[in-house]
From Swiss-Prot:
The gene is msh6. Belongs to the DNA mismatch repair MutS family. Residues 79-90 have a biased composition (Polar residues). One of its GO terms (molecular function) is ATP binding. Pfam families: MutS_I, MutS_II, MutS_III, MutS_IV, MutS_V. ATP binds at G1024, P1025, N1026, M1027, A1028, G1029, K1030, S1031. This is DNA mismatch repair protein msh6.
Length: 1254
């Protein structure tokens, strides 16, 4: 046939099917993505290293000889409109059909047709065809843009040749004459069915042989994205290139990616802060609720991308699109149910179902039949995940961390991470560089985080595989390296507070609820590695436990399942934060006893010489305090699960914790700490407005932690208090000393936490340099203090600290000669100085020789090609490519790797061999550097005790500095308290103010004089109107005493005190629903503790005792308690009340002083003006009606209330004046009869009982 006839025949054919052509063309071209022109090096590093290859379609001509494992297609990046500015096609073109969704975008086809080949354009985006073709074919590249690379060739070769014919027609307008013509078989573009897809599984495969090298800087390649394989997300541009390059390279064995789900949209927006979701509330244990209280572990569910609108069946009765889609979904669901039946019927490792009393939500049962079907990566994943079902597992794959199944659902629902439905498993992912950020976000929500890392690099695996003699599964080695919880964080970047974060184990021994329990306690601050242990017998109200928990405020608790009483659980709930994590672990097997602890210590080699090398406190507790050792055993087991047991125990940092320290410190129980708002306020539980917030002005984080301990235990000895006051006064009066201390303190990092990371061998090189620089600064400061201020500081605590601090000058100088500090700080690598380490020097020399050989080879090529402009170019992981001008001919055995308009880049066999030798040498050098890091840390840790002592001394100086700064911030007047050592208690404050009143209110605050003890009465009975300032006065006296005994100035014109042994408070009115205790019962319980424990040198504050019951009972109880305090105990204190008759009862008692808070009252308008002044006398009324008027109650209601009040006052006058009648009418005597086991009340013994209160 002639050429003309062929043309006519083709024209006729095209005339008959133009519409068919348009639909067919669009069906293909709408799947081809636009070429991205991003040139960001950091994006290149992240995206190119997480790519995986795909199989060449069966329809492609095999003569292309393209190695199906050689390409490394780029990931498609999120684009902005600006990316297409130069590639858009005229929207008015008749060839551009309206956008529509892909009717074959369902994921079901992969599970139904696993044997079919994969279509070449699977998972391509739905970009405009015009954009694609203009960018990929017609657009002229810039001078330095990539125009040729094997990857790009692979992308085009994977398409049928008819694509280019269709493309050519698309680029050139078609006449209207041809619009309705039908395409011939030759012209029809290749459009593979969605069913043509290779077998896939739920996760990415590790089975491939093409390793990638470490990424390097270079311009961004412009490539067509041919598949959306193992990279399910793209690292955003803001992730630095340095951090990306420092990461492990992607698995060589992952790049085949059998688990690819090409139809899914895998891109993820990450690393930007996620807006808070209002629908999810923060809870004490979000993870537990997610797995235990929420739905069971979700079965995988398919997702269908796009919206396929149903179409009618054709004339031949073929199923329409909707029916096919329904069939595919049913088959997909059936396959998942068959393969993952154990995810639908959830059981724990012991095969207990959800709801069973013994069900353990931490584990999952996987039947043996399921293991037989798993691929190597699946086995690796489930082997770890099955024991961490209550934990969100971050699984490293190359430069990304991925979350699967329920973990992925949490990431998607709570943090809006992009969710991808695999065939059997949902997945979300984050870049490796942003792990710390996302881990912190999950932990802040109450989740437990597990980190599974690659334990070898891709090149390292290749070297290891060559050394193997037997065939093994091709999967990169991974292992559980960390489990992170809010109570056991160790990384400085994740810790949100400078204060200690504790994880506490509690062991209880109790025979019955009515007996006094015994407790063993062990808690640890994992950021510093400090263990604290104690054992004690408590009262039935758990007073000591309450005090300890209030002081420590643990973030995480470990309790023995079914072995701790409900009373103790209620006491713990009352003291700890609602966000605290509760862990109930199994007795014996997990909550270890003495014998098991001893065996584990010996077997685990935690201390030098085994048990003999253990700290003294631990050895003594092993033989004497079994409850405390059992608590340590539980904590020991828990730390082992978190991979922290070796790091923490081997430090040997153990001490005994005494919550009361009765012999040396001022005792404040938990109730007092809460009532006085020492560490947490009553508003939101935060530190704003607390005494700690006011006084703690420490500069260093470790100084703040020590100051917290000081405030928990103010001093009791007058000598010790005066010694502290001397140092505070010295610093406050000497600006040069103050400036010197500030000068070296404010530049210090958190050395206490950092050296614990060095001990664990997990410190970064840059952090290690910070440690050394910090100790250099401290050592220099102590040298300066010794030289310049020893004379003025001699004889004070400051002088003792300066003299006692170890001098580490020689050791620090040795470290300056050990390695390059600048390189370690900036590049994160240890480079020993020449001659310091022979192995390192040899390896470094070998690398230099190999590089010299490469450059010698380059010089040889320059001569061979007679071109002096040849040079090496690194493109991604393809390093040392020979870059040659495009007009220079090269030998036929040179393989072109990439190129630009002006240059081409090549490899040859000789060059490849030398590059491989260099890369292997670099890999071995990294191993040597890793060993060097370990050697450095072991050497530093050999002086751990000296470093720690230097930190403690520095922290003490910081605390003294804080007290001097706090005193100056109090405002005038403030003074140094006078400490008087005498037998009887005494308090004197002139013009005392509340220290926590802010500066704006300080000028209007009314100061008061307070005198207790000595020549004055021990107890002040205080009356006054509501809102007159009674409670504020009571609190400010207690806080002034605490400040004085802490060693701080007090907000008064003059102060003189005898050191108190304890402070007890009973303030406010609250019930305890959890313990089934009414307001009155809570009042009496707290009062009972005070009566049991207070002594002559105790300061007692009782606010409106008796208001929780009837007037008569309340008055009787208040009378009896007050009488016992002033007549039998003799303590100092305040007793505020609204019972004016109580003042009459004690009007002539020599140890009671009657005082009131003054107020001016206008009866006509019912207005009360509070004067806030403490003066002698009894307030005649509480002026409740006046306060009611101020609150806005209706006048009619207030008038009626006044009339009723007058009637009640008259009716009760005779009752109040008759003590015998009070005793007879009150239930209080019945309470006494029960508690004291006295005989039944009779007319004879009632007067005797009443006499006991006089």
């Amino acid at each position: 046939m002639s050429v003309g006839n062929v043309g006519k025949q083709r024209e006729k054919t095209k005339d008959s099917s133009a519409k068919t052509k348009q639909k067919t063309l669009f069906g293909f071209f709408s799947k081809i993505p636009n070429v991205k022109q991003e040139k960001s090096d950091s994006t290149l590093s992240s995206s190119s290293n997480h790519d995986s290859n795909h199989d060449t379609p069966a329809d492609v001509d095999n003569s292309s000889n393209v190695n199906k494992n050689s390409s490394s297609p780029e990931r498609e990046l999120p684009t902005s409109p600006s990316h297409h500015a130069n590639t858009e096609i005229d929207s008015s073109s008749s060839m551009l059909p309206p956008p529509s969704s892909d009717p074959f975008s369902s994921p079901l086809s992969s599970s139904l047709h696993r044997s079919s080949p994969k279509r070449p354009h699977d998972s391509l985006g739905e970009e405009s065809p015009g954009k694609l073709l203009r960018t990929s074919v017609k657009q002229e590249p810039d001078s330095e843009e990539e125009i040729d690379s094997p990857t790009k060739k692979k992308s085009f070769k994977s398409l049928d040749t008819s694509i280019f014919q269709a493309e050519d027609q698309f680029r050139h307008p078609v006449s209207s004459k041809l619009e309705n013509s039908e395409l011939s078989e030759v012209d029809k573009p290749f459009i593979a069915s969605r069913r043509s897809r290779k077998p896939v599984s739920y996760a990415e495969s590790d089975e491939d042989e093409d390793f990638d090298d470490a990424p390097t800087k270079g311009s961004r390649h412009k490539r067509i994205v041919s598949d959306d394989e193992s990279d399910d997300y793209v690292e955003p541009d803001h992730i630095s290139e340095a951090s990306s390059e420092a990461s492990l390279p992607i698995d060589e064995v992952e790049s085949m990616d059998e688990d690819v789900d090409g139809y899914s949209d895998h891109s993820v927006s990450v690393a930007a802060p996620i807006p808070k979701k209002e629908s999810r509330k923060e809870s004490s244990n979000s993870l537990y609720e997610s797995y235990r209280l929420g739905s069971q572990i979700a079965s995988p569910s398919p997702s269908v991308s796009g919206s396929a609108s149903p179409t009618k069946s054709n004339k031949n009765g073929v199923l329409n699109r909707e029916e096919k889609r329904r069939q595919r979904m049913e088959a997909f669901k059936k396959e998942n149910n068959e393969r993952y039946e154990w995810l639908l019927d959830v059981r724990d490792a012991d095969q207990n179902r959800v709801g069973d009393p013994n069900y353990d939500p931490r584990t999952l049962y996987i039947p043996p039949s399921a293991w037989a079907t798993f691929k190597p990566f699946e086995k690796q994943f489930w082997k770890i995940k099955k024991d961490l079902m209550d934990t969100v597992v971050f699984f490293q794959k190359g430069k990304f961390y991925e979350l699967y199944e329920n973990d992925a659902a949490i990431g998607h629902q709570v943090f809006s991470l992009k969710l991808t439905d695999r065939v059997n498993m949902k997945m979300v992912g984050i870049p490796e560089a942003s792990f710390d950020y996302w881990a912190s976000q999950f932990i802040a929500k109450g989740y437990r985080i597990a980190r599974v890392d690659q334990l070898e690099t891709a090149l390292g695996k290749e070297i290891k595989d060559r050394q193997r003699t037997q065939k093994e599964e091709k999967v990169v080695q991974r292992g559980l390296t960390q489990v992170l919880t809010s109570g056991t964080l160790v990384d400085e970047a994740m810790l949100t507070s400078d204060l200690s974060t504790y994880c506490m184990a509690i062991k209880e021994s109790l025979q019955s609820d009515n007996e006094e329990p015994s407790f063993g306690i062990c808690f640890i601050d994992t950021s510093t590695g400090g263990f604290h242990m104690c054992e004690f017998t408590d009262d039935i109200h758990r007073t000591k436990l309450d005090t300890l928990l209030t002081q420590v405020r643990p973030k995480e608790l470990i309790l023995e399942k079914s072995k701790i009483s409900q009373k103790s659980i209620r006491a713990i709930k009352y003291c700890v934060s609602s966000s605290s994590i509760w862990n109930f672990i199994k007795p014996y097997t997990e909550f270890w006893d003495n014998e098991r602890v001893e065996r584990e210590i010996i077997a685990g080699d935690y201390f030098k010489n085994g048990l003999e090398g253990a700290p003294k406190i631990l050895k003594s507790y092993l033989s004497e305090k079994p409850l405390a050792i059992s608590a340590f055993g539980a904590l020991f087991w828990y730390l082992r699960q978190l991979k922290l047991d070796k790091d923490m125990c081997s430090m040997g940092n153990f001490d005994e914790y005494d919550a009361s320290q009765q012999s040396t410190s001022l005792l404040m129980n938990g109730q007092t700490l809460k009532n006085l708002e020492i560490f947490s306020n009553s508003f939101d539980g935060g530190s704003e407005g607390t005494l700690f917030h006011l006084l703690c002005r420490c500069v260093t984080p470790f100084g703040k932690r020590l100051f917290h301990t000081w405030l928990c235990h103010p001093l009791r000895s007058g000598t010790a208090i005066n010694a502290r006051l001397d140092v505070v006064e010295l610093i406050a009066d000497n600006p040069v000393i103050r400036d010197t201390i500030w000068g070296f303190l404010h530049k210090l990092p958190d050395l206490e936490r950092l050296i614990s990371r060095v001990h664990a061998g997990r410190s970064k090189p840059a952090d290690f340099v910070r440690v050394l620089e910090g100790f250099q600064r401290i050592n220099s400061a102590f040298d300066q203090l010794r030289e310049e201020f020893m004379e003025v500081a001699e004889g004070t605590l400051l002088g003792e600290i300066i003299q006692s601090a170890p001098n580490m000058k020689e050791e620090l100088e040795a470290w300056t000669r050990a390695f390059n500090w600048q390189k370690a700080s900036e590049e994160g690598v240890f480079e020993p100085e020449i001659g310091f380490e022979a192995e390192y020097d040899t390896s470094q020399k070998y690398q230099s020789e190999l590089k010299n050989e490469l450059y010698a080879l380059l010089e040889q090529y320059k001569k061979q090609l007679r071109c002096s402009s040849l040079n090496f170019k690194n493109i991604g992981k393809e390093v040392y490519q020979v870059e040659v001008p495009s007009d220079v001919k090269v030998p036929v055995n040179w393989c072109k790797m990439s190129g630009t308009k002006k240059t081409n880049r090549y490899y040859n066999d000789e060059l490849r061999k030398k590059i491989k030798k260099l890369l292997e040498a670099e890999e071995l050098h990294l191993a040597i550097m890793s060993r060097m890091q370990e050697k450095f840390y072991i050497r530093f840790d050999s002086n751990y005790e000296q470093w720690l002592a230097l930190i403690k001394y520095t922290a003490s100086i910081d605390c003294f500095f804080s007290l001097s700064q706090a005193a100056a911030a109090l405002g005038e007047p403030y003074c140094r308290p006078e400490i008087i050592e005498q037998k009887d208690g005494h308090l004197y404050f002139e013009e005392l103010r509340h220290p926590c009143i802010n500066a704006s209110a300080a000028s209007t605050f009314v100061p008061n004089d307070v005198v207790l003890g000595g020549e004055s009465p021990n107890m002040i009975v205080l009356t006054g109107p509501n809102m007159a300032g009674k409670s504020t006065l009571l609190r400010q006296v207690c806080i002034a005493v605490i400040m004085a005994q802490l060693g701080c100035w007090v907000p008064a014109k003059r102060a003189s005190i005898t050191p108190m042994t304890s402070i007890y408070t009973r303030l406010g009115a609250n019930d305890d629903i959890m313990s089934a205790r009414s307001t009155f019962m809570v009042e009496l319980s707290e009062t009972k503790k005070i009566l049991d424990e207070c002594g002559p040198k105790s300061l007692v504050i009782l606010d409106e005792l008796g208001r929780g019951t009837s007037t008569y009972d309340g008055h009787a109880i208040a009378y009896a308690v007050l009488h016992h305090l002033v007549s039998n105990i003799g303590c100092l204190g305040f007793f505020s009340t609204h019972y004016q008759s109580l003042c009459v009862d004690f009007m002539h008692h020599r140890q009671v002083r009657l005082m009131q808070m003054a107020a001016a009252v206008d009866e006509k308008i019912r207005r009360v003006t509070f004067l806030y002044k403490l003066e002698d006398g009894i307030c005649p009324k509480s002026y409740g009606m006046n306060v009611a008027s101020m609150a806005g109650l209706p006048e009619k209601v207030i008038d009626a209330a006044e009339e009723k009040a007058s009637e009640l006052e008259q009716a009760s006058a005779s009752f109040i004046n008759a003590s015998d009648d009070i005793a007879l009418m009150s239930d209080f005597l019945q309470v006494l009869r029960i508690s004291k086991s006295i005989e039944p009340l009779t007319a004879v013994n009632i007067p005797l009982i009443l006499d006991s209160f006089e």
